[in-house]
């Protein structure tokens, strides 16, 4: 299992992250598609090749091809949107009257239940640090009936995956060349 490979790669100082990674993969708050889509989208958002490869390999056992496509699509479209909306937000409303003019069709037609795509977009927005998108996706999730516990679990999953990526990047940076 690739999650096991990630856990084995984590150093002793990241023991808490290792334990959290074990716990989140056994989550009963999210269904399997929600959980593994969140983990996969979050892994893509970290931009860490090892994290994406290992989580991606295991996610294949839990996600349909459509869900895998949508999770990776959520990471890609949020990579664009998070930069745009976070940047526009820094400009104190001076550009809010202008139409973005960016294609975002996957948001309207993700090929999976809309709530799951929103959950994955929410998780990626947390990793990418876009408060505008995070709030907007949380509002949509609450509007379509996703409970607070599921939203919070997705936030935890994103945080854990981000922590795994940070720990592995630290190991790589400190390794002798």
UniProtKB/Swiss-Prot annotation:
It catalyses: N(6)-[(R)-dihydrolipoyl]-L-lysyl-[lipoyl-carrier protein] + a hydroperoxide = N(6)-[(R)-lipoyl]-L-lysyl-[lipoyl-carrier protein] + an alcohol + H2O. One of its GO terms (biological process) is response to oxidative stress. It is an enzyme of class 1 (oxidoreductase). Disulfide bonds join 130-133. This is Alkyl hydroperoxide reductase AhpD. Antioxidant protein with alkyl hydroperoxidase activity. Required for the reduction of the AhpC active site cysteine residues and for the regeneration of the AhpC enzyme activity. Together with AhpC, DlaT and Lpd, constitutes an NADH-dependent peroxidase active against hydrogen and alkyl peroxides as well as serving as a peroxynitrite reductase, thus protecting the bacterium against reactive nitrogen intermediates and oxidative stress generated by the host immune system. One of its GO terms (molecular function) is alkyl hydroperoxide reductase activity. HAMAP family: AhpD. InterPro entries: AhpD (IPR004674), AhpD-like (IPR029032), AhpD_core (IPR004675), CMD-like (IPR003779). Pfam families: CMD. Optimum pH is 7.2. Changing residue 137 to F: Reduced catalytic activity. Changing residue 132 to F: Slightly reduced catalytic activity. Homotrimer. Identified in a complex with AhpC, DlaT and Lpd. Changing residue 133 to S: Loss of activity. Loss of interchain disulfide bond with AhpC.
């Amino acid at each position: 299992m690739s999650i096991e490979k990630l856990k084995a790669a984590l150093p002793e100082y990241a023991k808490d992250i290792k334990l959290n990674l074990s716990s989140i993969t056994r989550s009963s708050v999210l269904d399997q598609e929600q959980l593994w889509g969140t983990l996969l989208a979050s892994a893509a958002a970290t931009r860490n090749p090892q994290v994406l490869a290992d989580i991606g390999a295991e996610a294949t056992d839990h996600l349909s091809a459509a869900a895998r496509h949508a999770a990776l699509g959520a990471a890609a479209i949020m990579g664009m949107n998070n930069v745009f909306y976070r940047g526009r937000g820094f400009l104190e409303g001076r550009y809010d009257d202008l139409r973005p003019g960016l294609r975002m069709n996957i948001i309207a037609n993700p090929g999976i239940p809309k709530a799951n795509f929103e959950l994955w977009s929410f998780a990626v927005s947390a990793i990418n640090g876009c408060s505008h998108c995070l709030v907007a996706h949380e509002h949509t999730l609450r509007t379509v009936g996703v409970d607070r516990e599921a939203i919070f679990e997705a936030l935890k999953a994103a945080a854990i995956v981000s922590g795994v990526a940070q720990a592995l990047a630290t190991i790589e940076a400190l390794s002798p060349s």
